[in-house]
């Protein structure tokens, strides 16, 4: 008797027709579980107040970001890992406390080349990655310690270029802040030899165009876009296309910031339109946040073409403090997530989350196994269920300050033992120091914070005295005199 192969029936003409029909109706099996595209949008010095959906101030206009929140998730307790640009970006991009890499502040840069970034983690899952806008993880004029260790008296291009995005896993890049960009593709999407490109147009529009150009050339994905808007950071600009007549009586710096934020919002809207046009909007996970809170500097309204280190016109309302502080206004920022059809729409999530969680969440979304080196957590199962995470503590160390948040409680330490304890859920403005009335809670969080600092480089609570800025800020925001530098 002729043997019949057990799979032969599927090759019957009618079976083949059915398989072909199913292929075109349902698509290939792999497509159902195709990893999502991932976009991380980081603004620069954007304060907690400055999205319309936050409901904190009346003058802000961000319709596209508000729509993103309504179609996704707004995290009301979103934190960065530092109240300053470079260390915050190092923590976000690696998913690890940046102090594990020896970075407490900007002078501790550059990001070590052996640090593993989100782009490098996603590469084994087939992702193509692009970095756009502000990088700020390379050596610069204040990284004196690194320069001394490497025998460098004055930085030259050959000292800096090895620390650009290509060295950290990015296949494509349009790196720059304002008028000059280091790029390996053009704004029409065509590849080019790596080199410097001058741009005369408004920086936010250029950075949006660079993101759109990359996405347009990679419609099949999966891709990872790390889009870093240099806004509303100083030096401020007030592009007429984004100014609104209703702002004319506001401080000049506030007007400029509002117009720059409107430009970011417009860019986010353009990205959404492009994703929809390419049929990618339901398979793209998007994060939106800031690198730290707004620098307020007493709200001094100097002309926008002066005082580059002053107030950037943004606001942290209703939070206490500003950029450079481990007060809420320095480290708590806008934090949105969207993944249409996957994450709930219109959710307000109140449990603390961190930019550390972006790497772990991206890892999980890409189908990669958990990495025990990551300090963040995968937010997807929590957000899908609307559940709080198992109790965890978030930590910070910056200048002479240390902080920890566990649940509703926050510990803050500055200098040699000035301590504060706040119930952040009840007191987001950090007005009521409960250190004296809650000694057990104070002791617990202090011990946790100290144990965490023992894992860092260098270990322990900061030993340096408060710097002149801290010596001004803590009396101003907390009503406590602290000793500054001798």
Residue ranges and their predicted role:
Residues 1-2, 19, 36, 440:
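Generic cytosolic/nucleocytoplasmic N-terminal low-complexity/intrinsically disordered segments
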Residues 31-415, 419, 428-447, 451-454, ...:
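Formylglycine-dependent sulfatase
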């Amino acid at each position: 008797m002729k043997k019949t192969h057990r799979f032969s029936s599927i090759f019957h003409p009618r079976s083949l027709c059915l398989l072909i029909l199913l292929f075109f109706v349902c698509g290939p099996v792999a497509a159902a579980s195709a990893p999502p595209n991932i976009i991380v949008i980081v603004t620069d010095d954007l304060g907690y107040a400055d999205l319309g959906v936050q409901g904190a101030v009346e003058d802000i206009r961000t319709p596209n970001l508000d729509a993103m929140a309504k179609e996704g998730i707004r995290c009301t307790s979103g934190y960065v890992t530092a109240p300053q640009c470079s260390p915050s970006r190092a923590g976000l991009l690696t998913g690890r406390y940046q102090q594990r890499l020896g970075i407490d502040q900007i002078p501790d840069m550059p990001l070590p080349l052996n640090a593993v970034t989100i782009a490098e983690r996603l590469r084994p899952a087939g992702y193509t990655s692009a970095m756009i806008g502000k990088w700020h993880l390379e050596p610069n004029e204040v990284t004196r310690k690194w320069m001394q260790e490497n025998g460098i008296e004055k930085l030259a291009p050959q000292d800096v270029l090895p620390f650009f995005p290509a060295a950290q896993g990015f296949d494509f890049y349009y790196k720059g802040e304002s008028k000059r960009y280091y790029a390996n593709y053009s704004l029409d999407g065509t590849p080019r030899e790596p080199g410097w490109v001058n741009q005369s147009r408004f920086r936010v529009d250029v950075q949006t165009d660079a993101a759109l150009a990359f996405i347009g050339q990679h419609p099949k994905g999966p891709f990872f876009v790390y889009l870093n808007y240099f806004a509303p950071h100083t030096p401020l600009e007030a592009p007429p296309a984004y100014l609104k007549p209703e702002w004319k009586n506001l401080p000049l710096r506030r007007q400029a910031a509002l117009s720059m934020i409107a430009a970011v919002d417009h860019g986010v809207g353009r990205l959404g339109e492009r994703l929809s046009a390419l049929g990618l909007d339901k398979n793209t996970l998007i994060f939106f946040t800031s690198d730290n809170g707004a620098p307020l500097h007493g709200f001094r309204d100097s002309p926008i073409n002066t005082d580059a280190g002053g107030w950037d016109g943004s606001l942290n309302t209703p939070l206490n403090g500003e950029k450079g502080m481990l007060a809420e206004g320095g480290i708590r920022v806008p934090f949105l997530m969207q993944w249409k059809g996957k994450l709930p729409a219109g959710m307000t999530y109140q449990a603390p989350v961190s930019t550390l969680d972006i790497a772990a969440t991206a890892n999980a979304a890409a189908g990669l196994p958990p990495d025990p080196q990551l300090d963040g957590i995968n937010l997807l199962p929590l957000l899908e269920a609307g559940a709080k995470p198992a109790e965890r503590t978030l930590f910070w160390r910056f200048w002479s300050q240390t902080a920890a948040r566990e649940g509703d409680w926050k510990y803050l330490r500055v200098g040699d033992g000035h301590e504060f304890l706040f119930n952040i859920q009840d007191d987001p403005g950090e007005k009521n120091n409960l250190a004296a009335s809650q000694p057990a809670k104070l002791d617990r969080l202090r011990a946790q914070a100290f144990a965490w600092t023992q894992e860092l480089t260098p270990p322990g609570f900061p030993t340096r005295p408060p710097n002149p800025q801290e010596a001004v800020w803590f009396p101003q925001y907390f009503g406590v005199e602290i000793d500054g530098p001798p």
